[in-house]
């Protein structure tokens, strides 16, 4: 499961790394991104724009938006089998930019860890998105992060990890690509290129959205 992450880089680095237009009036650095919040995504329909969608997928056919609270992650192994995800996987994919994600080790203290790339560059997690219309006609755009089995670093902390795409695979993920090739991208990121360290339990509360939580405990 991936239930929290950070995306706290400046506008210029976002433009340089992801090649997107950033609306400065909307974007701000986020140190503790949490489900149900509007968060940055780059979609296959608008690959040159940084949009803000609600975290927690609401399928277009859902009766109400509450289902989104249970759909923050989609398992790579079953993504083509689940009605909630398979249409979005085929037609509505996105990048979820981040600079780290957080996971809680399954020990007696439930120690939170920050996981990032060793070179400390921002990365993109593989996501899917959808749009849902309420009875009054209001449209909610939402997304889910795809997870896979853990690599050797992550398995010491948790049983799942988000799919982190290679930079060279990001256009393939957003492009008109067949399902077999897409599924081939949904694999664990190499452990030797990642690092993890324990952080403060301040991260447990999404209201603590400040740089302090990224520090080593």
Regions picked out by a protein language model, each given a short descriptive name:
Residues 1-217:
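Short linear sequence motif anchored by a di-proline
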